[in-house]
């Protein structure tokens, strides 16, 4: 199905007039080379710019998962165990809420200064997390850092696309996805290292400030000012007014109410509580209102509306969106819950449990690199997607079977299969632009960003709700009549090193661990579902070269 062309929202469209005369045929290779000059930034300056820009992307990936191994010490310091899920969900919530309006903003505001503004937001949120005096403060910091991080990620895509030549763009855009994914899987390792050291978990967040400070001179002095042609001739306030504020408010309310419903249900209050029912109704109403606002362009225009909904009418783009979402959800389940299993069952420290994630990490990185190099040469992306989905499904099913007495080597093997299943999680950033018209590439990238962000947000929220609800109910049934308080039981959910787990008699501790391991297994049901949908969607992809 064809997609009607409309003005691109980001850098790729605005870059075209500067580099390629639109009257020149796209397939005229020699003419295209003449029309596409080399990079304006070269040599050592280009190296420094790449290091600085990609380091921001790495930090964004790290902060997505860095709390996976430090939730227990954070909850212990603040004596807050029922809000553990917010440490991971808060960051992705901020990212998802802001990624759509920021994507529009990058189309009309100076890319350099908007990128710096988002970096500053991220640093401020990280500073609040590091110095947080309470759990509420750290949650606010995580949401704020996530909002800035979304802008950093979009800024990476925009900066790289502006500053590179058309021939270089696929390689550098692929690096953006690879570095982000690498950051995601290294997050638990770095967080665990800080948590187990004298620096404490707070330096997991202060690290961002150090790197931001070191790279700031490069951002300020070596990055050129990059005003967008689409925003020329209009004042700052005129540009602000043209953003889709109706869609932004409805999108924020929709995502926040959905996450509150999922995270609070069964933990802060029961699923049938009136407050939870109210949140469910509000989220449904806001979702319908958002869809209608985008379909009828209420308070905006088709060009300026927040969500590129026309891609949903294209079967291939819709399938890529679904695949992107399934991969993101399964990735976060593995990164968060493999280390948690080893902490509980083997009593591992934060750093040791994260080290046990290395088989998954190594195969993930290796296959992402292999896919990025080989898949464009073969052209038949359906094969790569299908194989990836099969490995993801098999790995998730095997992780579901893990019990208290499963050997570590078996868990490593299962995690490797899941790592192989992540091969194409970033491939849509290359496949999508190859199947849309050139003037829709920027919107395509934004479309994929939305799928990735929403899947991570919902995946983390649902996984946290499953684990906390089932573990709390199971441990309460096991220990509630044996003199242990609800606070003690909640602390056990936070980590294996809780005082309750340490003082339980051996037989009772084994029974408690079986409850916890069973809850972790149930989390993988979501990954199994994602893997199955991944396989089905892959089978429906077009059987042609790209």
Curated annotation (Swiss-Prot):
Q: Where is this chain's protein located in or outside the cell?
A: Vacuole membrane; Cell membrane
Enumerate the Gene Ontology biological process terms: patulin biosynthetic process
Induction of its expression: Expression is correlated with the production of patulin. Expression is positively regulated by the secondary metabolism regulator laeA. Expression is strongly decreased with increased sucrose concentrations. This decrease is lost in the presence of malic acid. Expression is increased with pH changes from 2.5 to 3.5 in the presence of a limiting concentration of sucrose, 50 mM. Natural phenols present in apple fruits such as chlorogenic acid or the flavonoid epicatechin modulate patulin biosynthesis.
Show which residues constitute the signal peptide: none
- Bilayer-spanning residue ranges: 41-61, 89-109, 113-133, 143-163, 171-191, 203-223, 245-265, 277-297, 318-338, 350-370, 379-399, 416-436, 447-467, 515-535
Which PROSITE patterns would you find in this protein's record?
MFS
Is Transmembrane among the key words of this record?
Answer: yes
Query: What is the protein's major site of localization?
Result: membrane
Query: Where are the compositionally biased (Basic and acidic residues) regions?
Result: 16-29
Q: Where is this region: Disordered?
A: 1-29
Application in biotech and industry reads: Patulin was originally used as an antibiotic and specifically trialed to be used against the common cold, but it is no longer used for that purpose since it has been shown to induce immunological, neurological and gastrointestinal effects. Genotoxic effects of patulin with dose-dependent increase in DNA strand breaks in brain, liver and kidneys have been detected in mice. However, more recently, it has been proposed that patulin might also have anti-tumor properties.
State the annotated membrane topology for this chain: Multi-pass membrane protein
Taken from the UniProt record, the cysteine pairs bridged by disulfide bonds within this chain are none
Keyword list (alphabetical) reads:
Cell membrane, Membrane, Transmembrane, Transmembrane helix, Transport, Vacuole
Note the superkingdom of the native organism: Eukaryota
Q: Tell me one GO molecular function of this protein.
A: transmembrane transporter activity
A GO cellular component annotated for this chain's UniProt record is:
vacuolar membrane
Q: Which InterPro entries match?
A: MFS, MFS_dom, MFS_trans_sf
Q: Which family does it belong to?
A: Belongs to the major facilitator superfamily. TCR/Tet family.
The protein's role, per its UniProt record: MFS-type transporter; part of the gene cluster that mediates the biosynthesis of patulin, an acetate-derived tetraketide mycotoxin produced by several fungal species that shows antimicrobial properties against several bacteria. May be involved in the secretion of E-ascladiol to be converted to patulin by the secreted patulin synthase patE.
State what protein this is by name. Answer: MFS-type transporter patC
The protein's organism comes out as: Penicillium expansum
Q: Please state the gene responsible for encoding this protein.
A: patC
């Amino acid at each position: 199905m064809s997609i009607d062309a409309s003005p691109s929202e980001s850098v790729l469209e605005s870059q075209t007039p500067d580099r390629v005369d639109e009257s020149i045929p796209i397939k005229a290779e020699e003419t295209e080379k003449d029309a596409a000059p080399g990079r304006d930034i070269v040599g050592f300056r280009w190296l420094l710019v790449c290091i600085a820009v990609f380091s921001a992307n790495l930090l964004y990936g790290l902060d997505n998962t860095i709390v996976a191994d430090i939730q227990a010490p954070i909850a212990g310091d603040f004596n807050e165990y029922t809000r553990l899920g917010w440490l991971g969900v808060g960051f992705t919530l901020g990212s998802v809420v802001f990624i759509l309006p920021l994507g529009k903003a990058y189309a009309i505001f100076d890319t350099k200064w908007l990128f710096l503004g988002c970096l500053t937001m991220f640093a401020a949120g990280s500073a609040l997390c590091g110095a947080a005096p309470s759990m509420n403060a750290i949650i606010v910091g995580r949401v704020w850092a996530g909002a800035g991080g979304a802008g950093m990620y979009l800024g990476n895509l925009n900066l790289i696309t502006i500053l590179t030549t058309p021939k270089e763009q696929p390689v550098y855009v692929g690096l953006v996805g690879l570095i982000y994914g690498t950051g995601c899987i290294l997050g638990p390792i770095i967080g665990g290292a800080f948590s187990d050291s004298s620096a404490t978990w707070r330096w997991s967040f202060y690290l961002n400030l150090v790197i931001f400070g070191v790279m700031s001179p490069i951002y300020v002095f070596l990055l050129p000012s990059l005003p967008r042609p689409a925003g020329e001739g209009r004042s700052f306030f005129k540009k602000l007014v043209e953003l889709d504020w109706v869609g932004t408010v409805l999108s924020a309310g929709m995502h926040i109410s959905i996450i509150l419903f999922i995270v609070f249900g069964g933990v802060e209050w029961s699923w049938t509580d009136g407050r939870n029912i109210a949140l469910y109704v509000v989220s449904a109403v806001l979702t319908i209102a958002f869809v209608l606002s985008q379909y009828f362009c209420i308070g905006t225009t088709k060009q300026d509306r927040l969500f590129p909904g026309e891609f949903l009418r294209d079967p291939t783009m819709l399938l890529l969106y679904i695949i992107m979402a399934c991969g993101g959800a399964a990735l976060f389940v593995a990164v968060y819950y493999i280390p948690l299993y080893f902490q509980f069952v083997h009593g591992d420290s934060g750093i040791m449990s994260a080290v046990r994630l290395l088989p998954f990490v190594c195969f993930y990185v290796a296959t992402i690199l292999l896919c990025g190099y080989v898949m464009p040469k073969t052209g038949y992306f359906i094969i790569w997607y299908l194989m990836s989905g099969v490995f993801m499904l098999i790995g998730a099913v095997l992780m579901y079977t893990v019990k208290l007495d499963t050997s570590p080597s078996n868990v490593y093997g299962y995690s490797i299969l899941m790592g192989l299943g992540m091969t194409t999680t970033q491939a849509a950033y290359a496949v999508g632009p190859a199947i849309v018209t050139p003037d829709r590439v920027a919107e395509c990238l934004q479309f994929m960003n939305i799928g990735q962000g929403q899947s991570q947000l919902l995946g983390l929220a649902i996984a946290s709700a499953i684990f906390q609800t089932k573990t709390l109910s199971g441990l309460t049934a096991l220990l509630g009549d044996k003199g242990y308080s609800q606070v003690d039981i909640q602390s056990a959910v936070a980590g294996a090193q809780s005082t309750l787990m340490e003082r339980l008699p051996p037989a009772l501790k084994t029974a408690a661990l079986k409850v916890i391991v069973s809850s972790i297994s149930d989390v993988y049901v979501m990954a199994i579902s994602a893997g199955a949908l991944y396989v089905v969607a892959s089978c429906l992809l077009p059987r042609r070269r790209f």
